[in-house]
Amino acid sequence: MATIKVTQTKSSIGRLPKHKATLRGLGLRRINHTVELEDTPCIRGMINKVYYMVKVEE
C-alpha cells in the first residue's frame, strides 16, 4: 500500500475540539511533527478535515 507523509504546519491552539482530535488521530502532536501513514480513504478524509493545519507529501 502507498504511504504519504503528513506534517503539522500550524498550531492546534484555539481550534475546534474535533479538529484537535483529528490531529491526534493522525498521530500529530506539535508543529513540524511528521508522520508517515498509509494512503487510505479514511486517512484522506481526516487530512481533508484539517487541511489548513497540515502539509501532505505523496
Curated annotation (Swiss-Prot):
Record GO cellular component, one term: cytosolic large ribosomal subunit
CDD domains named among the record's database cross-references: Ribosomal_L30 (cd01658)
Gene Ontology annotations of biological process type: translation
Molecular function via GO: structural constituent of ribosome
Keywords: Ribonucleoprotein, Ribosomal protein
Similarity comment: Belongs to the universal ribosomal protein uL30 family.
The protein's assembly and partners: Part of the 50S ribosomal subunit.
Protein name: Large ribosomal subunit protein uL30
